[in-house]
């Protein structure tokens, strides 16, 4: 059963004539006849009484309502898809890691909203694993996440690295470690740590680094809100390994100390950093507002939205 067969059926039913249906459809009468015959063959019944006027049979009357509904649904679907690729969608959903929501999106989002007043932006702060999952499940249009070695461009995903940033040690200003001129991985071992919950790639990055160095990771608390890290660290001997963008809000606060890890082998700062990328699906890049938002994010960071020290 094909759409043109249904359309031919509806036209004949409306006009009561194969000839008139052919004229209005700008095809030959034999074409209309073949389409109706094909439909009758598929349904295994006669749909019209052939005579001076084409009248619907009982089966034809029954089928008429269904055929109208099918064609109406097709028209609606065609219009919706056409509107989608013309950029007429009414909302755009973004999932982003907390640090991006705090540091960069507040200045970036108004630019998009100004150019697309008809689109409502919905932004959700999630861990990288969850953000990627909701993107792949079709619940959001764009995800801004922490990269990992298995995150590569595929036939389904379009990925653009945005920036890299150092991982810092956040601790209270009177923490015992602040007396050290240099802080190494081994120095961190004895102290309780606050880390991100499962589903956050920062947690995995920290766990992997401690494991690689065969240093026990003393986890005392799991959190997922940056502000909670500040409160816990400020009032205890707990420390937190956090990306630079998340320690920036408290870097000048006298209650905190922000330090970088030291590498004895090089005699310099330990190169412990993470990469952040923007991700969407390849098919979504064909939708104008999604492509524009994706490129806006890329350009935003290309212009130095984050200064990495």
Curated annotation (Swiss-Prot):
Family: Belongs to the LysR transcriptional regulatory family.
PANTHER family: HTH-TYPE TRANSCRIPTIONAL REGULATOR YBHD (PTHR30419), NITROGEN ASSIMILATION TRANSCRIPTIONAL ACTIVATOR-RELATED (PTHR30419:SF8)
Alphabetical list of InterPro entries matching this protein: HTH-type_LysR_regulators (IPR050950), LysR_subst-bd (IPR005119), Tscrpt_reg_HTH_LysR (IPR000847), WH-like_DNA-bd_sf (IPR036388), WH_DNA-bd_sf (IPR036390)
GO CC entries: cytosol
Matches recorded under SUPFAM superfamilies: Periplasmic binding protein-like II, Winged helix' DNA-binding domain
Annotated function: Seems to regulate utilization of fixed nitrogen by controlling the expression of a certain gene(s) involved in nitrogen metabolism.
Domain HTH lysR-type: 1-57
Record keywords, A-Z: Activator, DNA-binding, Transcription, Transcription regulation
DNA-binding residue intervals: 18-38
Regions annotated as coiled coil: none
A biological process from GO: regulation of DNA-templated transcription
Molecular function in Gene Ontology: DNA-binding transcription factor activity; sequence-specific DNA binding
Listed name of the protein: Probable nitrogen assimilation transcriptional activator
């Amino acid at each position: 059963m094909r759409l043109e067969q249904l359309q031919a059926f509806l036209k004949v039913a409306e006009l009561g004539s194969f000839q008139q249906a052919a004229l209005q459809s700008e095809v030959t009468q034999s074409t209309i006849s073949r389409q109706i015959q094909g439909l009758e063959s598929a349904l295994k019944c006669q749909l019209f009484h052939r005579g001076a006027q084409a009248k619907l049979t009982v089966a034809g009357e029954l089928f008429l309502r269904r055929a109208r509904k099918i064609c109406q649904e097709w028209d609606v679907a065609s219009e919706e898809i056409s509107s989608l690729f013309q950029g007429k969608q009414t909302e755009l959903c973004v999932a982003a890691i907390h640090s991006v929501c705090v540091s960069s999106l507040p200045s970036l989002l108004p630019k998009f909203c100004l150019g697309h007043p008809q689109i409502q932006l919905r932004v959700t702060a999630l861990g990288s694993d969850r953000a990627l999952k909701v993107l792949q499940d079709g619940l959001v249009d764009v995800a801004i996440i922490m990269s990992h070695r298995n995150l590569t461009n595929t036939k389904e995903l379009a990925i653009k690295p945005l920036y890299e940033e150092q991982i810092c040690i956040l601790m209270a200003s009177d923490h015992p470690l602040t007396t050290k001129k240099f802080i190494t991985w081994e120095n961190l071992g004895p102290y309780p740590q606050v880390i991100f919950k499962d589903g956050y790639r920062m947690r995995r990055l920290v766990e992997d680094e401690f494991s690689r160095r065969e240093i026990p990771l003393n986890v005392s608390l799991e959190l997922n809100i940056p502000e909670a890290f500040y409160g816990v660290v400020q009032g205890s001997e707990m420390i937190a390994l956090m990306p630079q963008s998340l320690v920036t809000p408290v870097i000048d606060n006298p209650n905190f100390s922000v330090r970088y890890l030291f590498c004895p082998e090089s005699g310099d700062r330990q190169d412990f950093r993470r990469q952040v990328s923007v991700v969407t699906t390849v098919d979504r890049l064909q939708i104008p507002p999604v492509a524009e938002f994706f490129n806006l994010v890329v350009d935003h960071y290309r212009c130095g939205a984050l200064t990495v020290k």
